[in-house]
Every structure is written in structure tokens, then in C-alpha cells.
Amino acid sequence: MLDVGDGHRVYWRRHGNADAPTVVLLHGGPGGGIFPRCAEFFDPAHWNVVMYDQRGCGRSTPTASTVANTTTCLVADLELLRLELGIDRMALYGVSWGTRLAVAYGIAHPEHCTGFLLSSIFLGRGVDIDWFLWGVRRLFPENHDRLLDAIAATTGERPTNRAQLLALAGEVFSSGEPDRKQQLANQWDDYEWRMMSVAPMPPLPTDPLELAKTRAKSLTLAILEHHFMASVLPAEGDLLEQVGRIGHLPCEIVHGRYDVICPAEQARLLAEAWPEAFLHIEPMDGHRIFAPAMAERIHEASRRLRRRIDADASRLGSAP
């Protein structure tokens, strides 16, 4: 555990070759926590793979805390982790929300980055939040209705727009009523889960202990996603305007054509703003990175990124 200040402690772990170039994995959400399977995208003989739970989620403590939990705080945590690891430069692999965090860190600390692998891009602009919370109703009306019904059931009022949705959900998540919070969090998580992939998603576990673990994660995810969408991201600038600070670094982007959570336009806009970005749109997949074709493209991108990092190091006469 790494003490990052503000009462937060961050859980981290390492895999692979400690003497190889480092890649740090940035999970989605915010609040999603690490998926150990993500380490499989990187050859353990050729990468020092580091993953960690961002503030308030996974094994990091305190759980689901929104206190001192902003993008700026998370960027500072990643810099503290780099210092803890004793490394000068590192690659970043971001998934969904983790792509925005990776770009934000790179903009703040370009001198400590070797390259980026980004999948299922989330830019975090107002238009992106609007789409996820309201616009997607055009494709998944019944799924969106279930979320609105859950808000109505827990607040007595059914939202009619994105601002109302966030305001009413905020009343529930900031309340001291655990049952209400869990009820809405379950539906919030289900809402996202049902749109994750082109193919049907696996059902929820039936074992009571496993289901309890899943629902605990649902609560953390819902609270932190809501916190960032309602309070943090609207106050931040458009990162696309600052990508030039890292535009000289290699970047591999993998995105599903039918990603309805984060439409492919976000990946295209990022690639257009990044001179050294290579964009691959997987033609038959959505947001889920573990879909077979998406996973294979990410594997390929990790190998390509390593070659590009090595080539840059050779050209500059430095270690990768």
C-alpha cells in the first residue's frame, strides 16, 4: 500500500520482468478497480507490469471516498507511484476512463512517459457524459428506462434530462441510507454492463458470496462515476487542446466500432490530435476489452508499442 496523502492509501502490485521497461495499467470507471487479466496483454518477459487501484476503489482505502478524489489527485498519485517504483520513465496503458487519466498524466509529466496504449477511449467532455447518461437512450431505450425507474424508485422523481439524473442520483449516493444507495448502484452498474459488448454479457454470479462482492464493487463504481461526472469533469478543460505536449510520443489506440458507451468518434478525435498515434478500429466489437478480437488487437498494439519505444530509445541513445 502506498500512502498518497489526504487519508488515502493506494494498493499496487507488480508482474513480469522487474528489469524490463515499465508499463503502468490505469483501470476504468472511475472506480472500476484493477483487472489482473489486463496484465496478460503484455509479455511478462519484456515488460515490468504495474497495476494499482485508484483512490477509493478496489483494495485502496477508504472505499468509495469522494474526498480529495479528482483527476488532479489521481495524477499526483501516479507520480508518487513512479517515485516509489524508482523509475524515471514509463509507458501507460489506459482503459476507458483510464485513457483520460493516462493523457492527463502525460500532459502534466511528459518527461516521464515513454509511450501510451489506450483502449476504449473516454475523453470526459460534457458531450461524452451527455451521451453516456442520456444520448445512448436512442440505442438502448429499455436499458435507459430501467435506470430512470431506479432513480424514481429511490427518490420519488423521474429525471427528464441529464442534469436532473445527476442531481437526483447525487441525493441518493450522498444519503445515509445504505439500502437506497445499493439499490440505485446495482442498476447503475447493470446499465453500463448491458451496453459493454456487441455479444450478450455473462450473467451475474449466482453464488451469494460472489454476488455480494459484485454488488460491493457496483456501489463503489456508481458513487465514483457519479462524483466525477457531476462534480469533477465539468470543471476540467478539454484535454484534446493540450495533447500537443505528448504528441511526439508513440501512442497505440484500439477502439471498438460498436462501442456505445464511448463512441468511436472519441478515438478518432484523439488520434487526429496526436501526430504519433496509430488508430485501430476493431470492426465488430464494442467497449469490452476482453472480447476475443479486441483482446488480440490490444496484444498486437502492446508489441508494436514496445518496438516503437525501443526504436525511440535507440535513436536517442537512451534506455527504453
Model-derived segments and their meaning:
Residues 5-62:
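Conserved HGGG/HGGXW glycine-rich cap/lid loop of the alpha/beta-hydrolase fold
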Residues 260-266:
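Conserved alpha/beta-hydrolase "acid-adjacent" motif
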Residues 72-90:
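Conserved acidic catalytic loop of the alpha/beta-hydrolase fold
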Residues 246-247, 253-255:
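Short beta-strand/loop motif that positions the catalytic acidic residue
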